[in-house]
Amino acid sequence: MNLNNIKPKEILPGFYGKIIHGEKMSWILWDIKKGSKLPEHRHVNEQIMYVIEGELEFTLNGKASICGPGSVIVIPSNQAHSGISRTSCQILDVFSPVREEYK
């Protein structure tokens, strides 16, 4: 498999993900346009997010923080979170179990 051959899917306005699913996890490389909003939500999946480039304001359980390159955020199952990209961003997300709705 070559990441360059995976066509990105627009999951939300401004969120373009190259998505790979394993048996028990999902891996997503996001390209996010400046000003794109991630509405507050929660899901059963555990999530680990790594910011490769750009800057976003991310809120987890009501606590907002500015995240830039090198930031890692661990999001436990069923925890409310949201965000907005302050610049164009590239982010790597890993989810377990699989994000079935992204298939």
Residue ranges, per PLM feature:
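Short, surface-exposed secondary-structure edge patches
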Residues: 39, 48, 63-65
